[in-house]
Amino acid sequence: MSMNPIADEMNHLIGTAREFQPQYREMYRELSDTVVRREYARGGQMLHRGYYCPSPVYDLIVGGVKRGRLLKRLPSAKSTPDVTFGFNEKDQLVTVERSGGGKEFIFYPEDGLELGIGFMSDRVCLVSECRFAQGRLQTYSCCYLAHGKDFHKEVFAYDEEGLRYLDWYTFCEYDNNKTSYEHEKYQFEHDEDGTLSRYRAVPCDDPFLRERKGLSQTMEAPFSVYDMEFEITQKRKV
């Protein structure tokens, strides 16, 4: 166990990837057999699962990242969708297939828990975990393993209006054994109809950032950033 709990969570997902490495193809076939409905999308290549990214706000905060759009018509023989989504009879998303060859299967081992295993080129390259309570997403974690180890986690806090705070963590281990760690916090506001209207960065008290032991850590944003508000133009209720 490391001194950083976020690093421990990353290592937990890496262990999950190793656990499923010998059987990922078989599990993908089994879950593919449960698909009763498919949806198709364009765009969203830069986002985990594209249109159905588990994070409700990732594309609102990260510039240049879009969810893409669902196609209203089935693709023709001359037209290949960027992403194909498969749903089971419970209307749960169970498979994701990208035109570039990457695939992912999603399963639900217990109530309130969703696990995703992504693979490409004969190896597991992505593991994700979502935890829900009372119908709301509480945490979303994702670890990319294609080049080094890139871990991302979002922790959500709600009030009577909806999403109020987001804690955003990233922890990376590179092939040269260097590491980086960041923790950002955002506060959200809503319109009268309950849709997200704006957000801003707020200070976060992270003891591990204060320690900075052995890490190449991005400095916290200057206080002037905390005075800036960013308008959300997309209508989204969270």
Each predicted region: which residue ranges?
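Buried hydrophobic residues that stabilize the cores of well-folded domains
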Residues: 1-238
